[in-house]
């Protein structure tokens, strides 16, 4: 059964509202890290500043730090050298050691866009494959909320981008220690 998104209440300037019939396939990526689920989750969230490349942001210049606030409604944001902050999205589900869901509040033009009705969504699951081995499954979905052209464009970009980000994450997760 296909999940459909309601079209935005009003279409953004220069962009058509997404018809209910549009469906854009989600991006699914996974990686196995040699650490337990609690540590894997902590590195992905509290430790994001250590693995998210500081040159991969949408703000004014390089990222000074990346933060995911640890609660539903918390922000995922970057702070830049000039002190400005750019919101990447908001936490929708926070289940430590198991699952994280965040809105991806970035337009296809790689600008912040706080309109929730246009946001895609990133879900990350942490699945134990042993006491010190975790499979991390990432699904980036709901691109159709952006409209056909913008949604397909964003999907193409993140389909190519998430593998490298997960490799950066895996390197950090593999480091010794049990907390970020």
Regions of interest found by a model, annotated:
Residues 80, 104, 138-140:
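Residue-level recognition of conserved beta-strand positions in structured domain cores
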Residues 47-88, 179-180:
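Short beta-edge strand/loop motif at the mouth of beta-sheet-based domains
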Residues 2-63:
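Hydrophobic ligand-binding cavity/cleft-lining segments
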Residues 95-100, 131:
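Short, conserved beta-turn/loop elements at beta-strand boundaries and strand-helix junctions
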Residues 2-9, 141-180:
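A conserved amphipathic terminal alpha-helix motif
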Residues 110-163:
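Beta-strand/loop substructures that line and gate deep hydrophobic ligand-binding cavities in soluble
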Residues 29-31, 88-93, 119-128:
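Hydrophobic/aromatic beta-strand elements that line small-molecule binding cavities or substrate pockets
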Residues 40-44, 76, 91, 102, ...:
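Hydrophobic pocket/interface hotspot
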